[in-house]
Amino acid sequence: MTIDKSETRVRIIMTLVYIIRHGETEWNLKGIHQGHNDSELTQKGKEQADRLGQRFKESNLKFNGIYSSDLGRALDTAKRICQPTGQDELIIKTPSLRERALGVLEGLTYQEIKDTLPRDYEQHTSGDPNYKPVGGESWIETQDRVKEALNEIAENHHNEQILCVTHGGIVSMLLRFCLNIPLNEKRKFAIPNTGINIFEHRHEAGWRLRTWGDISHFNESEILDEML
């Protein structure tokens, strides 16, 4: 008796997820906590998004689904990325991809938090994943929110590739979850604005990292800045 190997082959259900941090913002430059507050993209941030969109166009890269945080800095980035390929009308806005809510810390620099909210400063900088600023979220709550959202999005796009435009904290949490890096461990990796991060979501096996921090659409001086 011969066995047809094609019948025994397991069909892998996988979603390819491109996850992009928004372009540089005015508050990024000033070191101000953004959270659910918003800040305009700088000229550099706009150019970063425009060049990424042009890169996708030149490589003929299109997506079966496009999702963006509904915060302005992410949505503006998503539109600029998708306009060159004519896919900007496909963008779905969702609050589930927002940055961690920082409550009373939003709009403040680290120094301002240290001066006016010393107890919060101590907890905020300790890395405690359970610390929850007044009016905000803990890291654990944020990770649970984002994992649920990304799992649901991925499950709606079996064997397709999708784009998610979001925030640095959200990109960081997915990497930590994927590589089993504890939330309270000090970050030892960069999250460049508009860097390309690609994850695989497998229906049974979960998340796996494929590409991290690809900034080859940056010019030479910007790449050098990211390395400093």
Could you tell me what each predicted segment is?
Residues 3-15, 58, 83, 87, ...:
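Acidic, low-complexity terminal tails and accessory targeting/binding regions
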Residues 18, 92-94, 210:
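General small-molecule cofactor/ligand-binding pocket signal
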Residues 16-22, 164-165:
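Short, hydrophobic/glycine-enriched beta-strand segments
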Residues 23, 168, 215:
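Active-site metal-binding loops of divalent metal-dependent hydrolases
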Residues 51-121:
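Phosphate-coordination/substrate-recognition cap region in phosphate-metabolizing enzymes
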Residues 142-156, 160-168:
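GST-like fold's C-terminal all-alpha helical module
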Residues 120-135, 219-228:
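Extended, charge-rich low-complexity interaction segments
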Residues 24-76, 80-81, 132-147:
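Loop-to-helix element that buttresses phosphate recognition and phosphoryl-transfer chemistry
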